[in-house]
Amino acid sequence: MAYSARLRKAVGAVRATLSAVELCDVQAPEFAQHGDHAVAADAPLVLVACSGGRDSMALAAVSHIVCTSMGVRCGAVIVDHGLQAGSERVASEAADRCRALGLGPVIMRNATVQARGEGLEAAARQARYDELCAAAHESGAIAVLLAHTMDDQAETVLIGLLRSRGVDALAGMPQVFTRSGATFARPLLTLTRAETTGICEDLGVEYWDDPTNGDAVDGELPNDYPLRSRVRHDLLPAIERFAGFNVTRHFAESARLARMDKEYLDQRSDEVMGEAVAAVDRPASSAAVSTDAPRACVAGDTNDSGHGIGLMIGVKRIAREPEAIRLRVIAHALSQAGVNASAAQIAAIDRLVVDWHGQGGVSLPRGYSANRKKHVIRVCQDGAHANR
């Protein structure tokens, strides 16, 4: 069959993404030559995360085409969250459609969603990734492909700006990332939802429409719909009407540029963190502590009870950096210590670096606090500050 322009675009996007995850390194040599070749039973495996919707069914179909041409097995993993009536049937039908396309293995997983403080959407996402990671590890898959499109990227930027701020909010979703040791990739970030719908039509692929997307609802969606659905159904179209141009593409391109900035800032912050921050969690020892060189404290800067202090930040080193790097170093260090600090708390610790005049410490979640003594900021649970 002759490929449509959108199908050719999708094939190119999937092939480029597989190259980005270094799949070319494992391609069988004969598949570089023209002709029909059978994919070996022990060939590397790529999994497509499939919900049965139009985006993931289009990705499943295109990925099978591309993987087969590269000598790579293409399977699917389908996660049933059990949050909607009939979800088991939807998952089963998605599995049948993937098998009909030639994907294999087709892995079915049941997720247990336990909503806590983060809300149901976030809990479902966490449960889904847990199952996807488990499926990748158990099957030996070298990558899991996700079907997020340009529309999803634009929605993610708006959601990020509503919930957060700064370049991280603008950066959207990365094309390739790792989670719990599994590699994930998003090949369709350059394609629109209209294009994935068209690809399903081109290939005669059936799909399921999630009712929580609100596509069939006239007027604004009620507040009990998921935030992403409301952004998709109401906010993006309203911005587009106001702006008079394709804001989906505009936001997606902004995300691509912001991600380049974010990746540089993260890289630079990691370099500074390696020089300025020491994590301390070992048993007590008699090691001397230098207030000017926090890395000398790794051997065991503790209180009398033998509990580690958590973190030490070298003020002289971090003070030489611009504010953007300082704030990032502090935030990353706290995150690695399991402390989820607010922007105001991070800024207050930064003032201990650049505007210290003997002020008291900064209270942090989980009973932690940050206190400065000479040229070192110590971040620890409150009891560990004793006798410092």
Swiss-Prot record:
InterPro entries recorded: Rossmann-like_a/b/a_fold (IPR014729), TilS/TtcA_N (IPR011063), tRNA_Ile_lys_synt (IPR012094), tRNA_Ile_lys_synt_N (IPR012795), tRNA_Ile_lys_synt_subst-bd (IPR015262)
Catalytic activity: cytidine(34) in tRNA(Ile2) + L-lysine + ATP = lysidine(34) in tRNA(Ile2) + AMP + diphosphate + H(+)
CDD domains according to UniProt: TilS_N
Ligand binding (ATP): 51-56
The entry's keywords: ATP-binding, Cytoplasm, Ligase, Nucleotide-binding, tRNA processing
Enzyme nomenclature, EC number: 6.3.4.19
UniProt GO cellular component terms: cytoplasm
Cellular localization per UniProt: Cytoplasm
Primary subcellular site in the record, as a coarse category: cytoplasm
One example of a Gene Ontology biological process annotation: tRNA modification
MF terms (GO), sorted A to Z: ATP binding; tRNA(Ile)-lysidine synthase activity
Physiological role: Ligates lysine onto the cytidine present at position 34 of the AUA codon-specific tRNA(Ile) that contains the anticodon CAU, in an ATP-dependent manner. Cytidine is converted to lysidine, thus changing the amino acid specificity of the tRNA from methionine to isoleucine.
Protein family: Belongs to the tRNA(Ile)-lysidine synthase family.
HAMAP family listed in its UniProt record: tRNA_Ile_lys_synt
Comment block on domains: The N-terminal region contains the highly conserved SGGXDS motif, predicted to be a P-loop motif involved in ATP binding.
Name this polypeptide is given: tRNA(Ile)-lysidine synthase
Organism per entry: Bifidobacterium longum (strain NCC 2705)
This protein's encoding gene: tilS
